[in-house]
């Protein structure tokens, strides 16, 4: 009887030990939410990184090349750099309609001569950053009609340091040839760098 009585408590103790062991296993499940936490944090970091392009203030820089053709030995006119630049539809009717602000930071003006060696005269150019002149007023910058040459103008000379609205011209380039005939002179080939900001 005594031996049977001893066996009874042992079973009870063993059952109690099993219950305690079962209880100690349950808290392991609590660890799983902690594993999910870093995933959510990492997800948020990725979200912030992916949103950066939306807030980019600039649209980068584009390079445009266009020409003004059929210049004569007595030609004159104005090239209006900005939304009025009809000679370069890719700028005036294209990219400027996609951005609120722009600035032309440099231009390279090449006069490519198509004149004969005997054609006399020169073609003069002037930059008008006020966009008001109707005729050439300065004869400092010039090209000999019978020779190909190029000139480069940086931001300081073309009002290109600050961004401005894409609805207004940045500057004009007036030109005038001093020849007395309508002989073929050549063409302007103009390369310009344009910075863009704030997409529409």
From Swiss-Prot:
Q: Is Isomerase given among the entry's keywords?
A: no
Where is the protein found, in the record's own terms? Virion
Segment Disordered: which positions? 1-54
Which spans does this entry mark as compositional bias, Basic residues?
Answer: 37-48
Its function, per the record, reads: Major capsid protein.
- Family statement: Belongs to the luteoviruses capsid protein family.
Q: What is this protein called?
A: Major capsid protein
| Source organism of the structure | Barley yellow dwarf virus (isolate P-PAV) (BYDV)
């Amino acid at each position: 009887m005594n031996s049977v009585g001893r066996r009874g408590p042992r079973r009870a103790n063993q059952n109690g030990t099993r219950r305690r062991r079962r209880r100690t296993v349950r808290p392991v499940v609590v660890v799983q939410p902690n594993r999910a936490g870093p995933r959510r944090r990492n997800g948020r970091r990725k979200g912030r990184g992916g949103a950066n392009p939306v807030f980019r203030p600039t649209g980068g820089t584009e390079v445009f090349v266009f020409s003004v053709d059929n210049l004569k030995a007595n030609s004159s006119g104005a090239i209006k750099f900005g939304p009025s630049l009809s000679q370069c539809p890719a700028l005036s009717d294209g990219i400027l309609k996609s951005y609120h602000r722009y600035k032309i930071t440099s231009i390279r003006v090449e006069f490519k001569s198509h004149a004969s060696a005997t054609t006399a005269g020169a073609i003069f150019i002037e930059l008008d950053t006020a966009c008001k002149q109707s005729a050439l007023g300065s004869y400092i910058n010039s090209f000999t009609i019978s020779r190909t040459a190029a000139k480069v103008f940086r931001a300081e000379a073309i009002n290109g340091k600050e961004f401005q609205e894409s609805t207004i011209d940045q500057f004009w380039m007036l030109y005038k040839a001093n020849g007395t005939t309508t002989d073929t002179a050549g063409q302007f080939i103009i390369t310009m760098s344009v910075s863009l900001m704030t997409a529409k």
